Amino acid sequence: MEYEFTLKFAVPANNPSVDELVERLGEAGCEVALVGIGQAGRIALEFTRDAASAKTAIFSALAAVKTAIPSVQLLEVTPDFVGLTDIADCVGVSRQNMRKLMLAHKDDFPVPVHEGSAALWHLSPVLTWLRERAHYAIPSTLLDVAHIAMQINLTKEASQIERGVQRELVELVA
């Protein structure tokens, strides 16, 4: 199956030129990735990768990037963090329709991971809810990629928790 996802990285300043990085990425198996370098010190790679599973597609891409540029630091795997407009775009409805659906089901619509001037959700639980509760036709490949992206992003963030704090928090947040 074909899986579409984006890997975003921080690149240390002491790395070679962008052209050299792109060449290394190609040699490591990322030759079909669309490379974005719009912000200094950042690189984004958009993949459409054929694999047996989303996990295999994303993990093999991560491994290839780390082989090509060992000093990069993963910032985010997408699609994962989304606003209401992003969710609406994913399922092909207007933002207003998605907002109406969310408000009509406020008791069981997935809880955002951040509420501020704009709320943010993990895409995976929202897509699962839309498929199971609202009967939207969500492509399995999108759902699988969103799930693995969320798992990777959560793991990356959780790795920053101090061990002592983590033990105490497990009971408090469960």
Each model region followed by its residue ranges:
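A short, structured beta-strand/loop element
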Residues: 17-42
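A short, Lys/Arg-enriched interface patch at domain edges and termini
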Residues: 125-174
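Short, conserved charged micro-motifs
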Residues: 13-20, 53-58
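Polyanion-binding surface elements
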Residues: 78-100
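Short glycine-/aliphatic-rich beta-strand segments at the starts of folded cytosolic domains
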Residues: 1-13, 82
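A short, exposed loop/beta-hairpin motif centered on an aromatic-Gly-Thr core
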Residues: 42-54
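Conserved short beta-strand edge segments in small beta-sheet-based binding/regulatory domains
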Residues: 32-38, 63-80
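Major-groove DNA-recognition helix of helix-turn-helix-type DNA-binding domains
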Residues: 93-119
